[in-house]
Amino acid sequence: MAIDTVVLDIEGTVCPITFVKEKLFPYFLEKLPSFLSEISNFTSLQADDKDPIKAILSQLPEQIRTSKDSVLEYFNDLVRRDIKDPILKQLQGFIWKLGYENGDLKAPVYEDSIEFIKTFPSKTENKRIYIYSSGSIKAQILLFGYVDENGKSVDLNEYLSGYFDITTAGFKTQSSSYTKILEDIGKEHGGSVLFLSDNVLEVEAALEAGMESYVVVRPGNAPLTEDDKTKYKIITSLEQL
């Protein structure tokens, strides 16, 4: 069955895996203290607060939001352990948005990925691209809205048909998440849908759900075992599709 829909992972697939851990995460941790310093009472935060930071933090367990230091320590620990926490993702998305908008941040999407995203979609042939990342949908839209192309910031969101994250589809190593995506994009079968990721556990989950799925190998990605190399289809560039 011909592929008419591609679901893309982000880090390690369409942009360097180092961008998130060496640029986005440190930027978030650098800016977070100044935002927390503006809050005088962490115990009385409300979900309907007009301040988006306060509204996000109100979702934290009461035992965490006792003080600035407690909240800061909590998020530092989550980032250090790379925990995919929905509240953390919301907060990161808000702070990264400011960074993209003021020019501090620009996404280093691979040239082959930029070209693929621009050329694969076709309304006449009903070809579509979706994004599925552990980062929040807001963070995904931001990243693709501020892509570094030859030193200029370009917006690739117009080429994308939709986005999924752990709150809308589920965790990426669970096959049920890919079944949910197939349902949401109107696909009864996954044979015409290709999922690309650097993570073999995610690729395996997509295959279990009936999708086609390849492992993407990029500089800096975790090395594959010999078994992985024989078990999965592997590409090193989206030009190979």
From Swiss-Prot:
Subcellular location: Cytoplasm; Nucleus
Main location group: cytoplasm
Catalytic activity line of the entry: 5-methylsulfanyl-2,3-dioxopentyl phosphate + H2O = 1,2-dihydroxy-5-(methylsulfanyl)pent-1-en-3-one + phosphate
Cofactor notes: Binds 1 Mg(2+) ion per subunit.
Gene Ontology molecular function: acireductone synthase activity; magnesium ion binding
GO biological process: L-methionine salvage from methylthioadenosine
Entry keyword Flavoprotein: no
Keywords: Amino-acid biosynthesis, Cytoplasm, Hydrolase, Magnesium, Metal-binding, Methionine biosynthesis, Nucleus
One GO cellular component term: cytoplasm
Tagged with keyword Cytoplasm: yes
Metabolic or biological pathway: Amino-acid biosynthesis; L-methionine biosynthesis via salvage pathway; L-methionine from S-methyl-5-thio-alpha-D-ribose 1-phosphate: step 3/6; Amino-acid biosynthesis; L-methionine biosynthesis via salvage pathway; L-methionine from S-methyl-5-thio-alpha-D-ribose 1-phosphate: step 4/6
Record-linked Gene3D superfamilies: 1.10.720.60, HAD superfamily/HAD-like
SUPFAM superfamilies: HAD-like
Binding site for Mg(2+): 9, 11, 198
Co-factor requirement: Mg(2+)
EC number(s) on file: 3.1.3.77
InterPro entries named among the record's database cross-references: Enolase-ppase_E1 (IPR023943), ENOPH1_eukaryotes (IPR027511), HAD-like_sf (IPR036412), HAD_sf (IPR023214)
Residues the entry annotates as binding substrate: 133-134, 172
Enzyme class: hydrolase
Similarity comment: Belongs to the HAD-like hydrolase superfamily. MasA/MtnC family.
Subunit structure: Monomer.
Function: Bifunctional enzyme that catalyzes the enolization of 2,3-diketo-5-methylthiopentyl-1-phosphate (DK-MTP-1-P) into the intermediate 2-hydroxy-3-keto-5-methylthiopentenyl-1-phosphate (HK-MTPenyl-1-P), which is then dephosphorylated to form the acireductone 1,2-dihydroxy-3-keto-5-methylthiopentene (DHK-MTPene).
Protein name per the record: Enolase-phosphatase E1
Organism: Scheffersomyces stipitis (strain ATCC 58785 / CBS 6054 / NBRC 10063 / NRRL Y-11545) (Yeast)
